[in-house]
From Swiss-Prot:
GO BP term, example: regulation of gene expression
Basic residues bias locations: 139-148
This protein's name: Nuclear nucleic acid-binding protein C1D
Predominant localisation class: nucleus
Organism (species): Danio rerio (Zebrafish)
Pfam families: Sas10_Utp3
InterPro entries: Exosome-assoc_fac/DNA_repair, Sas10/Utp3/C1D
Similarity annotation: Belongs to the C1D family.
Role description: Plays a role in the recruitment of the exosome to pre-rRNA to mediate the 3'-5' end processing of the 5.8S rRNA.
Length: 148
């Protein structure tokens, strides 16, 4: 009954925000448990170097973000704390990894295939017929008939 009275004291917007925060916190807790359940070395063995970098950056960013939230709950302004520079540094590396990933996904041009494609696209059957006809006419003027 005391809980009902306490809940009624809060506006519904705050109650909704608290419920959202609680569900988000549970989700984060489940993700952290999933990450911690397998050893880091086992997890890294299954990944290529780029994926390893992504995992390390994601872990560092998540940990620093949680520390940011901790500072807020303690009344410390995180914008004046060195954690802000650390998050910016991690974000810079995340952008570098994203650029590398985008470059890998970018289309590569096969010059030989492109030249064949252009050559064949420009080829015209009528031109070929005209060329064959003129060659045949020129050969026809100088044809020798031999009797065997």
């Amino acid at each position: 009954m005391a809980d009902d009275a306490a809940v009624e004291d809060y506006p519904t917007e705050i109650e909704d925000n608290l419920n959202d925060f609680d569900s988000s916190l549970s989700s984060v807790q489940n993700m952290v448990q999933t990450l911690v359940s397998v050893s880091r070395s086992d997890r890294l063995l299954k990944l290529d170097p780029l994926e390893q970098a992504k995992l390390d950056l994601m872990s560092a960013y998540a940990l620093n973000s949680m520390f940011w939230m901790y500072l807020v709950t303690q009344g410390v302004n995180p914008k004046d704390h060195p954690i802000k520079q650390e998050l910016e540094r991690i974000r810079t590396y995340m952008n570098k990894v994203k650029e590398i990933t985008d470059r890998r996904k970018a289309a590569h041009i096969d010059k030989e295939a492109a030249s064949r494609f252009v050559r064949n696209a420009l080829w015209d059957a009528d031109d070929k017929k005209r060329k064959d006809k003129t060659e045949h006419q020129q050969k026809g003027k100088h044809t020798k008939f031999t009797w065997s």
